[in-house]
């Protein structure tokens, strides 16, 4: 269980929905969507500022923190479209049914990514965090802020039925407890991050008691472009970081972007999820008050250096 200094407890003694980050270097991983290779390659890569240690070594030594924005399950992009549609055809035609090769491949990729996330948390402690996304809902629940979903096919219901058929009810209940334990927001010195843009202003007290507030959970994992209340990002930054004139930003995934990133909320929100790119965002906390710089890096093969491809100046 994480330290209360890192993740303050709620009234019942459980970890709350806010994670505090104090490392100088923070690496933010956009929506995984079954891309275990992206996360593995990142951990085995070298950051240009630290050429003598891999990212996983930096995280273990307390030099950096890796923050995943959730959505660990269900492939997206061109490969996701192909595989989900093939699995849906097999289900409808009855040729192979639910337990088809396409469905096994899809769920195998999702579970591979999930197991890597679950392994890294105890291995790296405060050096690794995974926030909750709307796809982190293996049983396709409509409770506790979650909603059933579909995109290319009936991913939610098909995935839940497959998991139950392969592993039974008991493991599904365990996975539900795990999903509900995920934090919603990570806060550094001059930035916050969540899966989706905050629908309404959020504050530390609300995040602390998130387990009993399904509306809050939904507002941080399901908000689409143009749905957030005006000023919600800035008010949330003030509440979580304290009022200040320095450059600050909220970083999110959820909605895909066409290039490296997109600004929203008057450049105070930075979206970084492009399912066709193997990219991460890197922040140096408190490096300068003249302006915030978020660097976007391409993740290559294990053992290579992260390659800087773009930079953003939100706030």
Regions picked out by a protein language model, each given a short descriptive name:
Residues 1-315:
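Feature recognizes metal-dependent phosphohydrolase scaffolds
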